[in-house]
Structures are given as C-alpha cells and as structure tokens.
C-alpha cells in the first residue's frame, strides 16, 4: 500500500468523521432549537380565509397570522390582539378598533416590508372577503366558506379608516356574535403592501401560496405530502411588549376585561365598553424556537411511532385506541379537554328520498348511537342530542333525542314508499378528527344497522381534497362528518352547519334550507339577553328534531399528545395546535 494512498485514505476518513460530526451537531442544534409536529394531512391553502379545515388552520392561522382579537386559551374569553382596544356604539352597530403600533410583517426571501402593520392592512383583509368588487376577491377561487356560511359580509355596511391606527366597522343590524367572529381562525390580517407588490408583478395568487403575516412564525418552504418548514419571526410584536404589569395594573386590567367580556357575552356594550390589551398576550405568546417543521404523516400509528422514538415532538389526533399506550409512556404527555364540537350524520336533503323528513327519521331510528359511541370513541365522547355540547351556555339537557327503534324505521320507510333493497351511499371522511376519529368504522356499523331495516348502503371515500370537493358538488346521499367551534357563541354551530347561506359556502353538508330556521337564528342575534337567546335556541332544537336534516351523534374530548420536553403546550378551546410560546427543556 503506497504512502500516497494511505494519506488519501486518512484524509477521506477524517473528512467523513468531520461531516458526521457536523451532521450530529446540526441535528443536535435543531433538536435544541426546533420543534417537529406530526401533522395528519396537507393544508388546502396557506390562507385560512379560503378554507375551514383544521389542517389548514394549523398550518396557517395558528402559526403565521394574527387577528384583531383572540381567544384566551384557558377561558375562551375574547382578548385583544392586533387591536389593542375597541369601543362599541350605544346602538351596537359601530365598532371602533384602536390598532397596535410597531407590528411588523414577516421579512422573507420573497417579500421585505417597508412599513409597519396599519389600518390599510385591516381594511384590505376584510374587504377581500366581503366585497366582490375588491381586486383580490376572486383570487384563488373567490370562496370564503366561513364568512359566507355566517352571512357576515352581507351585514357589514362599511369598513372605514379613521387614521393610520384606527378602524371603524359599521354593521347593518346588531350581531351579538360579531366580536367572536373577528377572533376566529379565519379572520386573519394580510399585508396590503405584499398584495400590491404581487399585483404589480401579475402574480396575485402567490399571496395564498407564499404567505406573509404578523404571526410568531414565518413561512419558509413546503413539499406536499412531506413537510412544511417555518422559521421564527424575529420581529414578532409580542417580543417587543413591555414586561408584565404590576399587580395593581394587572388587577385593573383584568377587571376591565371581566366586565367587558360579560357585556360582550350579553351582546351589550356602549361607548364605555373599552378593552386595553397592552398587558395581555392573548392566545399566542412569544416563539422561543428557531424552526418549526410539520412532518406530514397521514397514518395515526406511524405518527405515534415517530412520537415515541422522538422523531416528532408532538402529534395530531391520536387515535382512541392509542390513548392508553400514550398514557403508559413516562416520557409522553397526553393533555385532554372536553371539546366544543359535534360529530354527525348528515343527509343530502336535495336528493330524493332524503328530502322527505320521514325517511330521515327512519334512518335515524335505524341506528343505535350508544353502540357507535362505544365502538368508535371508546368512552372519549358524550352522546349528542343537539348540535350544542354541554360547555355551551345555551346547552339544553332536556332536548328531544332520536332513539334506536328498527321497527319504527321499517314502518316509516314503508309508509314513505321506500322499498326493501333501496340503496344509498354513506360518505366517510378519510381523515381523523376529534369529533369522529374513525368515520370508516362508524360507516361500517351504520351499514349493518341499515341492512337490518332493508336498506343497502355503500361506503364512499376519497382523498381529503377530492372528498371535500365532491361534497361541495352535492354528490353524496349522506355523510359522516362534523364541526369544531370557531368561537363560543351558539350561532357558530347553528348557522355554518344548517343555514341557507351555508349551502353555497360548503359547510351545510345537509344542503338543507329553512326560512323558519334562519329567522330564529337572526332573531337570536338581535337580543342582548342571554335568557332570551337561550329560549330561541330551544325552539331551534325542536325544529331540528322535527325535520332532522342531520343526526347528532357525539361531542368528543380533544387530546394533544407530545413529548415531555415541550413546555407551554396548551389545548385551545376551539381546536387546533399552536406553537407560539412553546419551548423545549434541554
């Protein structure tokens, strides 16, 4: 062996060792300063105005953006965010928002902001979804499902710039849920300056593909079916906030918030309804990690395996069958909380014979909901009588509920002219959700129940994007799906799921429209009195029981599994995972 060869071999070995050492150091550096989250699917978009799925919200609203208002993660109360305070007129129609100063948008490889966030960004963001004449309204399809489903655009008379840091929004009629809707995942604030830059280059669609926000993380890269990479937003405005207030200041502030939130909950609040957010961090806190990776892993069992081996720090939607495994692992944490959600079986009421309430009643009587809960949820859910869970202030414990009665089911079907052997489809969503962790299994159980009453059911499923598109097209006979609340107002369940306006937006899976129902919902938003609203919602529950466009099945607990090294993880009351303020204990 020549001396020259030995030298070259030694050099190669040293180089390999150096590379391995650097790689190990880089991996350790990322482990110390980065978080990997095992996500279940691809986001539909990086603009949550355009999509209502929790996958999209997790990858966009919760990490990239801020809103005018937020929800406190513990109490669910409305707290300031980009709006530091607000005033409400005596007639309840005009809302004046004071905006924070020194808030910067993300500085990325594709956009460098030249100014701070201001009133122009608020007006641009709201007018995009509310005005069809807006130059960005039809970009990326021109559908804004959440806002369409609640009819908010039709109720806003104007959005006006008072000055650079003050905006006034005037409504056409009172809406006791208005502030709560501004705090939802979908009411994000975009950069008008970035939009203008894209318009000048003829690429407006990039605003939803290469996002820019003010949130705790900024977008870096995305590879479909593989990963999303976020970087820390170094100029995040919450990092610039002053230290926490003194105890006297905190007491004064908390009293103001307590009073104002009570007025908001009661639909009240005149010129003296003021909230000052200078000492409040809301639901997003300071990011203390340099990188955030979403590892897109559709299979729940694989997500759990990655969590257990440390390849992921947290995981989405652990399966009910995995909960005991997670609880038994000393290095893992399983947080849980009753969910503000509803899992249901919806009938396409625009397709015969499902347009007949008696047929819908027959199908509801054919299934045993208790068995579905035991087999699919494993004691991690409660039986649903109405759309509202027990945590809602309008919950009705004595509401009417469907009962398992196959004899009645056969009679109703026969009386409606539905002959034995009638066939239908049950669409089962292909993703796991807290409100229905295994739609396919539930569909199989319902399929057996229906066979007992002479109905042959075929189970249909597609990939998530195709599934949602075909639902929007109304190709289903029935579907197993659900809803997680975006805010604590009862209207957030009733209106998006079953109002006439929610059909074109795609959130009304029953495609059911009732003028009586819509009138009751509108009446409920006109009153300031909680007892009056509750009484109206009792009428709503009775109407839904009589006409049964869908069968409420379960209100599920929400779970979040993560490694013990993570600190600051919380379960948001309205769903989703947020990594602002989460850090790793080294």
Q: Which residue stretches match the model-derived regions?
A:
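Extracytoplasmic/peripheral linker and loop segments enriched in polar/acidic and small residues
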Residues: 373, 394, 452-468, 495-564, ...
């Amino acid at each position: 062996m020549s001396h020259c060869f030995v030298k070259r071999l030694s050099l190669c070995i040293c180089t390999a060792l150096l590379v391995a050492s650097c790689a190990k150091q880089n991996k350790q550096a990322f482990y110390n300063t980065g978080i990997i989250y095992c996500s279940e699917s691809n986001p539909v978009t990086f603009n949550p105005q355009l999509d209502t799925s929790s996958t999209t919200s997790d990858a966009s609203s919760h990490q990239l953006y801020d809103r005018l208002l937020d929800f406190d993660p513990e109490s669910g109360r409305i707290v300031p965010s980009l709006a530091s305070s607000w005033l409400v007129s005596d007639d309840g129609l005009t809302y004046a928002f004071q905006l924070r100063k020194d808030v910067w948008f993300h500085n990325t490889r594709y956009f460098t902001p030249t100014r701070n966030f201001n009133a122009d960004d608020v007006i641009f963001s709201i007018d995009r979804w509310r005005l069809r004449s807006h130059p960005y309204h039809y970009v990326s399809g021109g559908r804004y499902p959440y806002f369409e489903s609640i009819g908010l655009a039709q109720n806003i008379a104007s959005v006006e710039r008072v000055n650079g840091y003050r905006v006034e929004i005037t409504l056409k009629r009172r809406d006791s849920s208005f502030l709560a809707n501004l705090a939802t995942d979908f009411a994000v604030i975009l950069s008008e300056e970035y939009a203008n830059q894209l318009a000048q280059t003829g690429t407006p669609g990039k605003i939803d593909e290469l996002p820019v926000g003010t949130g705790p993380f900024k977008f870096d890269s995305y590879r479909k079916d593989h990963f999303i990479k976020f970087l820390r937003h170094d100029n995040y405005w919450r990092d610039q906030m002053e230290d926490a207030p003194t105890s006297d200041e905190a007491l004064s502030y908390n009293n103001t918030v307590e009073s104002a939130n009570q007025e908001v909950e009661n639909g009240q609040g005149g010129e003296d309804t003021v909230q000052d957010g200078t000492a409040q961090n809301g639901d997003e806190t300071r990011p203390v990690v340099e990188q955030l990776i979403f590892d897109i892993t559709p299979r729940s069992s694989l997500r759990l395996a990655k969590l257990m081996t440390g390849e992921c720090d947290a995981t989405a939607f652990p399966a009910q069958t995995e909960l005991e495994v997670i609880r038994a692992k000393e290095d893992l944490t399983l947080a849980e909380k009753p969910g503000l959600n509803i899992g249901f079986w919806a009938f396409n009421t625009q397709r015969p014979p499902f347009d007949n309430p008696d047929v819908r009643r027959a199908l509801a009587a054919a299934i045993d909901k208790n068995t579905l809960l035991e087999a699919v949820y494993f004691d991690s859910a409660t039986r649903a009588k109405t759309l509202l869970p027990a945590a809602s202030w309008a919950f009705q414990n004595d509401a009417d509920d469907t009962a398992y009665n196959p004899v009645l089911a056969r009679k109703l079907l026969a009386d409606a002219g539905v002959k034995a052997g009638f066939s239908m489809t049950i669409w089962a969503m292909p993703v796991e959700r807290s409100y229905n962790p295994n739609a396919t299994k539930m569909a199989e159980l319902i399929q057996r129940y229906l066979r007992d009453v002479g109905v042959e059911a075929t189970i249909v499923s597609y990939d998530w994007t195709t599934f949602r598109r075909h639902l929007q097209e109304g190709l289903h006979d029935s579907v197993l799906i659900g809803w997680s609340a975006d805010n604590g107002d009862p209207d957030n369940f009733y209106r998006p799921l079953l109002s006439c306006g929610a059909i074109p937006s795609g959130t009304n899976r029953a495609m059911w429209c009732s003028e009586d129902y819509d009138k009751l919902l509108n009446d409920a938003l006109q009153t300031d009195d909680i007892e009056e609203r509750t009484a109206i919602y009792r009428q709503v529950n009775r109407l839904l029981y009589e006409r049964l466009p869908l069968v409420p099945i379960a209100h599920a607990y929400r779970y979040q599994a993560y490694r013990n090294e993570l600190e600051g993880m919380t379960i948001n009351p309205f769903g989703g995972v947020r990594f602002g303020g989460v850090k790793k204990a080294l």
